[in-house]
Amino acid sequence: MTIKSDKWIRRMAQQHGMIEPFEPGQIRQDANGNKIVSYGTSSYGYDIRCAPEFKVFTNIHSTVVDPKNFDEKSFVDFHGDSCIIPPNSFALARTMEYFRIPRNVLTICLGKSTYARCGIIVNVTPFEPEWEGYVTLEFSNTTPLPAKIYAGEGCAQVLFFESDEECETSYKDRGGKYQGQVGVTLPRA
C-alpha cells in the first residue's frame, strides 16, 4: 500500500467524485480574510471540514452509554457556526464533504494539531473500500474547561492508501451498517 499525493487526490475527486464538495488547494482564510483552521488538499492528504450539525453529550436522563443499545437521549442536538463542548465531555458532528472511496483504497483519518494542542481530540475510524457517505466525527474535550470547535473549518486530515490489489470483499459488498450515512450517525449494533 502506498500513500497517495495531492495530484492523485485532485484527479480522483475531480474525475470520479471521490470528495464532494472538493477544494483543490489549501484554504487558510475565510471570505473576509480572517484566519481559520485550514482545510482542503495538502501534500499527502485532505483536510476535512466540520458541518454546522452537532450532537453534544448530556447527562439529563442519566442513561448508561451502551454501544449495543444506544439511547438517543444521551445527546442534545445543536446547529451553529461553532459548538462548545463541556469540560471532559464529547460531541459528534459530520463532515461537510461526502466521500466515495474506491475499491482498492483505504483511508486513515487523524485529528489536526491545532485542535490537539488545545486538548480537543478528533477520532474517526478508517474509511473502508467502497464506503460512501458523510463522515461522522467524534470530538473529545480532554480539558477541565469548555472547548470550542468550528463548523466550516478544518478538523482532521484524511490520508489515502492504495493497495496493490483489490480486496475480495468491500464495505459495500458486506452491507456495512454505516454505508450512505447522510447526517450525524449514532452507534448501530
From Swiss-Prot:
The active site is at 138 (proton donor/acceptor). Keywords: Hydrolase, Nucleotide metabolism, Nucleotide-binding. Gene3D superfamilies: 2.70.40.10. One of its GO terms (molecular function) is nucleotide binding. It catalyses: dCTP + H2O + H(+) = dUTP + NH4(+). Belongs to the dCTP deaminase family. Homotrimer. PANTHER family: DCTP DEAMINASE. HAMAP family: dCTP_deaminase. Catalyzes the deamination of dCTP to dUTP. This is dCTP deaminase. The lineage of its organism: Bacteria, Pseudomonadati, Pseudomonadota, Betaproteobacteria, Burkholderiales. The gene is dcd.
